[in-house]
Amino acid sequence: MITSKVKAAILGESTLKSAEINVETFKGIVQLSGFISSQTAANKAVELARAVKGVTSVKNDMRIK
């Protein structure tokens, strides 16, 4: 449930629509991986994930391409 909410938040952000971000969740910990266009975009994705109810922490494994 948290995974789909995080994905929806990321897809709803116009600056991240084309990003290739994978979302995995385990016990409230969200792991973001994949490729992103800039550090600013990565920070935005982490910020959006943290804002989702039920998320206790976010691990950023995204790579800038």
Predicted feature locations:
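N-terminal targeting leaders
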Residues: 1-65
